[in-house]
UniProtKB/Swiss-Prot annotation:
The gene is MT-ND4L. It is a multi-pass membrane protein. One of its GO terms (molecular function) is NADH dehydrogenase (ubiquinone) activity. Core subunit of respiratory chain NADH dehydrogenase (Complex I) which is composed of 45 different subunits. Belongs to the complex I subunit 4L family. Signal peptide: none annotated. It is found in: Mitochondrion inner membrane. It comes from Sminthopsis douglasi. This is NADH-ubiquinone oxidoreductase chain 4L.
């Protein structure tokens, strides 16, 4: 169980590093955020079942719902930005002019 938790924490940290490194493209940032949410979902599910905290069983599902909403809003923004500006470079955007 410890090695699984350690692997999931490492996966979360790698996705966080990906967000920090690949923040110039919106698509790369969204993919790294999805990796972070997936590792958090699996880690929360494993911890809840390991410690028998079944009163918290809905928490990973709520996280998954928020993750799906975040992905939908992010993809909608990506489509809108790509249509108006021609690329997904975050540095070329000035949201005050839109």
């Amino acid at each position: 169980m410890l090695s699984i938790n350690l692997n999931l924490i490492i996966a979360f940290l790698l996705a966080l590093m990906g967000v920090l490194i690949y923040r110039s493209h919106l698509m790369s940032t969204l993919l790294c955020l999805e990796g972070m949410m997936l590792s958090l979902f699996i880690l929360m599910t494993l911890l809840i079942t390991h410690f028998h905290m079944f009163s918290m069983a809905m928490t990973p599902l709520i996280l998954l719902v928020f993750s799906a909403c975040e992905a939908a809003i992010g993809l909608a923004l990506l489509v809108k930005i790509s249509a108006t500006h021609g690329s997904d470079h975050v540095q070329n955007l000035n949201l005050l002019q839109c």
